[in-house]
Design a protein with these regions (language model features):
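Single conserved hydrophobic/aromatic residue that forms the stacking wall/gate
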Residues: 2-13
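Phosphate-/polyanion-interacting regions in eukaryotic proteins
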Residues: 17-68
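Charged, amphipathic alpha-helical linker segments immediately N-terminal to NTP-binding catalytic cores
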Residues: 54-101
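Phosphate/oxyanion-binding active-site loops and adjacent basic polyanion-contact surfaces
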Residues: 86, 188-192, 276
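Amphipathic, well-packed alpha-helical segments that form the structural scaffold of globular domains
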Residues: 91-95, 118, 253
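Conserved ASCE/P-loop NTPase catalytic core
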Residues: 98-233, 250, 373-376
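Phosphate-sensing "switch" segment of ASCE/P-loop ATPases
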Residues: 211-218, 223-326, 330
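C-terminal alpha-helical "lid" subdomain
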Residues: 298-383
Length: 383
């Protein structure tokens, strides 16, 4: 036949048709991604006989997307900007006005939230005052992530539903952010804790006879009172009981001090020209698959003997994510100075992991009391 029919998806889809000439004109745009936005024009195709039913036909499709994702072009473009200019570009791409921040530190604190957008299986905890934009950023910036707010969370919903034979949230998402985590009810604490520990360690999960793997990061987002904004106090006491175990907390790579971010105000809302948000979220998604940056980190980071493996891996993952965000043009160890690598990648990664280590000492002093992260340092490129 001269038509391309939708088959195997139920009777409704059998009554839809794409004429051959329309398919030839639109197929490239329709198939370039798993999801596409565009303007669709539909028409009615009359039946060939009284015994047949009419069909809805596609007349035309106009792609909304005004760009093509070219990762190499994006990397090359970074060389045309200073670091401060690039930081402002990133903030504009996520709908924030860089001029509304009081300091570079505040800007970098906001950009730190994007680490799990660019690095696979990066697990983070952020506690912050209300109104700092946690829900918006993790729920609206990228279509590749998932924000779950309050309610009930089960192993079936997170990993795999045996009854329905469907994959859970970690499958097919870049991250799963549990917003207002203090209000989430976990149906079976021991079951959920065991599943999380296994997945956060190696990216694999087993539910019944089903074995799965995914690349989604796990993000905990919670509100914290001003009196508890101290990394040397127990900041995790209000978290659900499932997270009151040191072995699980140890699998979170870093902690974000959300209180370093300003409360959302009108001055922080984007105005004027900015990088397209959908384009930027797609770029971040593509960066997850680029192994170049981890190779640079491995070459530039000196690891002391007998360093704790989880600490080292956590710091390197966070460091890699910072490198992708702030210096995407870096493709070789010598492409970034030791000063910039240490100040903007390694040092903040160590600080984020150190807070997890301090909290572990408070939560489980017998196992982690007095322990610190290894003293990783920057190697010169000629070493």
């Amino acid at each position: 036949r001269d038509d391309v029919e939708s088959r195997g998806l139920g009777d409704v889809y059998k009554r839809q048709v794409i004429p051959r000439d329309v398919w030839e004109n639109c197929s490239a745009a329709l198939l370039k991604a798993e999801e596409n936005w565009g303007i669709v024009e539909l028409g009615y195709q009359f039946p060939e006989s009284d015994r047949d039913a009419g069909k809805i036909k596609l007349v035309s499709f106009q792609d909304f997307c005004p760009y093509i994702i070219d990762l190499d072009e994006y990397k090359y473009a970074r060389e045309s900007f200073t670091l401060d200019e690039w930081i402002d570009i990133i903030l504009g791409a996520i709908d924030y006005n860089a001029a509304g921040y009081e300091s570079r530190q505040q800007k970098l604190a906001m950009i730190t939230r994007l680490l799990p957008f660019v690095e696979k299986r990066l697990n983070l905890i952020e506690l912050a005052p209300k109104g700092t934009g946690k829900s918006y950023l993790f729920g609206s910036v990228s279509r590749y992530g998932w924000l779950s707010s309050g309610g009930t969370m089960s192993r079936a919903k997170m990993f795999y539903d045996v009854a329905r034979r469907t994959e859970g949230l970690v499958f097919g998402h870049d991250y799963v952010a549990l917003d207002e985590v203090q209000t989430i009810n976990f149906t079976d604490i021991d079951e959920m804790r065991g599943a999380l520990k296994g997945y956060m360690e190696n990216g694999k999960y087993t539910v019944g006879n089903h074995e799965g793997a995914a690349d989604s990061g796990i993000i905990l987002l919670g509100n914290i009172p001003a009196a508890s904004m101290n990394e040397y106090l127990n900041m995790f006491s209000d978290l659900p009981k499932v997270f009151h175990e040191s072995a699980l907390i140890d699998r979170f790579h870093g902690f974000l001090k959300g209180w370093e971010l300003p409360r959302m105000n009108d001055d922080l809302k984007i105005c004027g020209w900015a990088l397209n948000s959908e384009y930027f979220s797609s770029i971040m998604h593509e960066l997850r698959d680029d192994p170049t940056y981890r190779a640079v980190v491995d070459a530039r980071v000196a690891v002391p003997e007998k360093s704790d493996t989880r600490d080292t891996e956590a710091i390197k993952r966070i460091c890699t994510a910072y490198l992708k965000l702030l210096f995407p043009n870096v493709q070789h160890p010598e492409d970034i100075s030791s000063h910039d690598f240490n100040l903007f990648c390694l040092k903040p990664a160590i600080e984020m992991r150190s807070i997890i280590k301090i909290q572990l000492g408070i939560l489980d002093p017998e196992e982690f009391g007095g322990k610190t992260v290894p003293e990783l340092s920057v190697k010169d490129v000629d070493e």
